Amino acid sequence: MKLLIVEDEKKTGEYLTKGLTEAGFVVDLADNGLNGYHLAMTGDYDLIILDIMLPDVNGWDIVRMLRSANKGMPILLLTALGTIEHRVKGLELGADDYLVKPFAFAELLARVRTLLRRGAAVIIESQFQVADLMVDLVSRKVTRSGTRITLTSKEFTLLEFFLRHQGEVLPRSLIASQVWDMNFDSDTNAIDVAVKRLRGKIDNDFEPKLIQTVRGVGYMLEVPDGQ
């Protein structure tokens, strides 16, 4: 597995490179945003570890540009910016995980391995595949086991949000803010109703079931173990 680290702090970059190399990865290190973006665009990386506060080009812009260019490798943001607003922004832009400095290397390594295991979701330019679910973001075509599925505009947006964060627990509040652009009202069941309708189209007549309920929190899209 080949990783790219984009980190301008020399000691942190060297520490990450040494630890991940010893863990069996091939590692490239870029010490500024411009070089990191160039390597990410031209190299064949399985995962990127990306700082946000970088010289030349910041991490926010790198995530945005990579996703706009249909680069689908997992991105782990590693940064000192630790507010909820920063975390939500990173996920909204298309990052797959977010870890705040200072960090424990064991946790970072576990997160890297988890992201790499999420190979069940394959992004090929504008296409997602999870199990037998196929989604084309450009044509907005959705099929499961070869059967065409018709979604409303909002159902498609909700499904796309699940796909971009496959394997992550998504709280109802985050779904509300990112898919409906509204604050979550705990007295309404709007999110649950929308998810139920989406399940009715992509899960009810198929196996395995992909949208999982995380009781008391929200939802997660993943292929169940053993499937």
Swiss-Prot record:
Biological process (GO), any one: response to copper ion
SMART domains attached to this UniProt entry: REC, Trans_reg_C
SUPFAM superfamilies per UniProt: C-terminal effector domain of the bipartite response regulators, CheY-like
Free-text description of this protein's post-translational modifications in UniProt: Phosphorylated by CusS.
Chain positions with 4-aspartylphosphate modification: 51
Domain (Response regulatory) ranges: 2-116
Intracellular or extracellular location(s): Cytoplasm
Main location: cytoplasm
InterPro entries associated with the record: CheY-like_superfamily (IPR011006), CusR-like (IPR006291), OmpR/PhoB-type_DNA-bd (IPR001867), Sig_transdc_resp-reg_C-effctor (IPR016032), Sig_transdc_resp-reg_receiver (IPR001789), WalR-like (IPR039420), WH-like_DNA-bd_sf (IPR036388)
Record feature DNA-binding region, as residue ranges: 125-223
Pfam families cross-referenced by the UniProt entry: Response_reg, Trans_reg_C
A GO MF term: transcription cis-regulatory region binding
Keywords from the UniProt entry: Activator, Copper, Cytoplasm, DNA-binding, Phosphoprotein, Transcription, Transcription regulation, Two-component regulatory system
GO cellular component, one term: protein-DNA complex
Role played: Member of the two-component regulatory system CusS/CusR involved in response to copper and silver. Activates the expression of cusCFBA, hiuH and plasmid pRJ1004 gene pcoE in response to increasing levels of copper or silver ions. Can also increase the basal-level expression of copper resistance gene operon pcoABCD.
PANTHER family cross-referenced by the UniProt entry: REGULATOR OF RPOS, TRANSCRIPTIONAL REGULATORY PROTEIN CUSR-RELATED
Further information: The cus system plays an important role in copper tolerance under anaerobic growth and, under extreme copper stress, in aerobic growth. HprSR and CusSR form a unique regulation system, where both two-component systems recognize and regulate the same set of genes, but under different environmental conditions. HprSR plays a role in H(2)O(2) response regulation, while CusSR plays a role in Cu(2+) response regulation. Under low protein concentrations, the two regulators recognize and transcribe both hiuH and cusC promoters, albeit at different efficiency, apparently in a collaborative fashion.
Official protein name in the record: Transcriptional regulatory protein CusR
Record gene name: cusR
